[in-house]
Every structure is written in structure tokens, then in C-alpha cells.
């Protein structure tokens, strides 16, 4: 049985740990609020550019653009978004498990796929398994700006146009609520659903100088926006997952402290009882 000193030492160290996890929980809650606002504020822009691109797609169905053309899939790229740090529960493991499983099920060899990694955890995961990484981005701040990911997004789109890969899938954690995040996979390139526009016709446009030249500018911006929007979504999910993980850690620490305190009190009571018994026994022996 552990000594009173050992139990008291464990109680002290657990209390210090709970203070740290509580502080991290509060910090993550504040970051979540900002990240959620950033993700929501980007939605109107996404809706509008999707509406405009869909309108162009409807009125110019015969326009040929490299980002719209499907071709024989010889190689697939997966843009996987994770965090740079851990302590976020199943945030990273869920998205990595989903991406890795998809690669194993769909492809016969590593020559058929490659990874574009955003986040240190994902990059290290794929490097450890010797999965080819054709581009990576780490060290992003808690409040991501488009400037930080612009080069990677444009490089990714250009690699698709140049034929480095034939499909691009986006894998990330979609923010549902503070307690729920869903692993989401979307086929980003080629852009194949522009003509549908979700079945909603909102306005008619006149395009100058031509639909083709408008698409030449809009399509890369649209694809870049999809990547940036997914990253904002993932950031909100990361902070939510870390907040929940730290809350669970704090709650578990409190339960452990209660259990240790009970053990400490019992051990102390047993020690006192033992001392009283020894005193009484000694007194009886002297009579």
C-alpha cells in the first residue's frame, strides 16, 4: 500500500496538472470563438463565388478549361489537413485514419497516390509510412489568413493542370458544433459540378470580355477558396476538439484527486488506529 507521503505527492502533482489542463481549456474556448467566427464570415464569399461560377458553367457548357476536364485517373493526390500540435483528442487520428484507409483501399501501389500535407502531425504520419509527399505546409497560426496558404493552393492547382496528378481529394475535419466534428472527404479537382449550382438560379449575368476569360480567372480563385474554407473549418474543429479534450482531462483529474483524497484519509485513519492500538497494547502490557 502506498505511503501517506506518496499519496499526498500524487494529489499535489495531479492538482498542478488539472490547473494546466483547465487553463488550456479556457484558451481553446477563446480561440474556438474566433475561429468559428472566421469560418462563418467566409461563408457569404464562398456562396457568392460559387453562384457566379455556377452561372458561368450553365451558360457556357462548351467551354473547355483544364480544371473542368476529367481524364483517366493514373494518380490521385490527397490534401490532408491536420494540426501542428497534439492534445486534441481524436482530431488528428480520425482524419489520418480516414485518409490512410482510403489510400489503402483504392490503390495498388504508392505510385498511384501522393499527399499534400497541411499540418505537422499529418506530415510526420505520412513520412513515417514512406508515403510520397509532394507539398507540405506547417507552422500556421491559430487565425489563418489566405496569404499563408495562397502559395500552396496555387501550386496545388498548377500541379493538377500540369498533369502531376489527375484527381485531388480534400480530407479534413468539418466543424459541426463545439462537441461534434466530422471527418469529411471531397473531390476538389476536377471541378465537375459547376453547371448544377445546387439547382438554384439566382441571377443572370453578362460576362465581359467573355465567359472563357472570366472562367480563367474565377476557377483558380474558386478552388483556392475551397481549400481556404476547409482550412478555416478545420481550425475551428481543432480548437473545439482541444477544448473538449482538456475539459475531459480536467474532469478526470478531479475524479483522481477525489479518489486519492479518499485513499489518503483512509490510510491516515488506519495509521492513527494502528498507533492507538499500539499505545493501548503497550499500556496493557505494563499493568
Curated annotation (Swiss-Prot):
Keywords: ATP synthesis, Cell membrane, CF(1), Hydrogen ion transport, Ion transport, Membrane, Transport. One of its GO terms (cellular component) is membrane raft. Gene3D superfamilies: 3.40.1380.10, ATP synthase, gamma subunit, helix hairpin domain. The keyword Ion transport applies. The gene is atpG. It comes from the Bacteria. F-type ATPases have 2 components, CF(1) - the catalytic core - and CF(0) - the membrane proton channel. CF(1) has five subunits: alpha(3), beta(3), gamma(1), delta(1), epsilon(1). CF(0) has three main subunits: a, b and c. The F(1)F(0) complex interacts with SpoIIIJ and YqjG; YqgA is found in the same complex. Interacts with FloT. It is found in: Cell membrane; Membrane raft. Belongs to the ATPase gamma chain family. HAMAP family: ATP_synth_gamma_bact. It is a peripheral membrane protein. SUPFAM superfamilies: ATP synthase (F1-ATPase), gamma subunit. One of its GO terms (biological process) is proton motive force-driven ATP synthesis. Produces ATP from ADP in the presence of a proton gradient across the membrane. The gamma chain is believed to be important in regulating ATPase activity and the flow of protons through the CF(0) complex. This is ATP synthase gamma chain.
Amino acid at each position: 500500500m502506498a505511503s501517506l507521503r506518496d499519496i499526498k505527492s500524487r494529489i499535489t502533482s495531479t492538482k498542478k496538472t488539472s490547473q494546466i489542463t483547465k487553463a488550456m481549456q479556457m484558451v481553446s474556448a477563446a480561440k474556438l470563438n474566433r475561429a468559428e467566427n472566421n469560418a462563418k464570415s467566409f461563408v457569404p464569399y464562398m456562396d457568392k463565388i460559387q453562384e457566379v461560377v455556377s452561372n458561368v458553367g450553365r451558360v457556357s457548357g462548351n467551354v473547355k478549361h483544364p480544371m473542368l476536364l476529367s481524364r483517366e485517373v493514373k494518380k490521385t493526390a490527397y490534401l490532408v489537413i491536420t494540426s501542428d500540435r497534439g492534445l486534441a483528442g481524436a482530431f488528428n487520428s480520425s482524419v489520418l485514419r480516414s485518409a490512410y484507409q482510403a489510400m489503402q483501399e483504392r490503390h495498388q501501389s504508392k505510385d498511384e497516390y501522393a499527399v499534400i500535407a497541411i499540418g505537422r502531425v499529418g506530415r510526420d504520419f505520412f513520412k513515417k509510412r514512406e508515403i510520397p509527399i509532394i507539398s507540405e505546409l506547417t507552422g500556421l497560426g491559430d487565425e489563418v489568413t489566405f496569404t499563408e496558404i495562397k502559395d500552396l493552393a496555387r501550386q496545388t492547382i498548377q500541379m493538377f493542370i500540369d498533369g502531376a496528378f489527375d484527381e485531388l481529394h480534400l480530407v479534413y475535419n468539418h466543424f459541426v458544433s463545439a462537441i461534434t466534428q466530422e471527418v469529411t472527404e471531397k473531390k476538389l479537382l476536377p471541378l465537375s459540378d459547376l453547371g448544377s449550382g445546387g439547382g438554384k438560379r439566382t441571377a443572370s449575368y453578362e460576362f465581359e470580355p467573355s465567359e472563357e476569360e472570366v472562367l480563367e480567372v474565377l476557377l483558380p480563385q474558386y478552388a483556392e477558396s475551397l481549400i481556404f474554407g476547409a482550412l478555416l473549418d478545420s481550425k475551428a474543429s481543432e480548437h473545439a476538439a482541444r477544448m473538449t479534450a482538456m475539459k475531459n482531462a480536467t474532469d478526470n483529474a478531479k475524479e483522481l484527486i477525489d479518489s486519492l483524497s479518499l485513499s489518503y484519509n483512509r490510510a491516515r485513519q488506519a495509521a492513527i488506529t494502528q498507533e492507538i492500538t499500539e499505545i493501548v497494547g503497550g499500556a496493557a502490557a505494563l499493568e
